[in-house]
UniProtKB/Swiss-Prot annotation:
Gene3D superfamilies: RNA-binding S4 domain (3.10.290.10). The keyword RNA-binding applies. The lineage of its organism: Bacteria, Bacillati, Bacillota, Bacilli, Bacillales. It comes from Bacillus subtilis (strain 168). This is Probable ribosome maturation protein RlbA. Keywords: Ribosome biogenesis, RNA-binding. PROSITE patterns: S4. GO terms for biological process: ribosome biogenesis. Pfam families: S4_2. One of its GO terms (molecular function) is RNA binding.
Amino acid sequence: MANPISIDTEMITLGQFLKLADVIQSGGMAKWFLSEHEVLVNDEPDNRRGRKLYVGDVVEIEGFGSFQVVN
């Protein structure tokens, strides 16, 4: 079961999502984090911090777990 991460907007970038999910401490860490960890968005590898995530998307992060974007 994926951990729900609530957003108040229509979409959020992957970099913003990592901070909101408490995976990273600051937005500046996103580029480094994505280069060092495998991240799957809807079961597809993605390392773009600007990747747009919408409600229903599932983000899996090796070593951190699975998260789902919700309203």
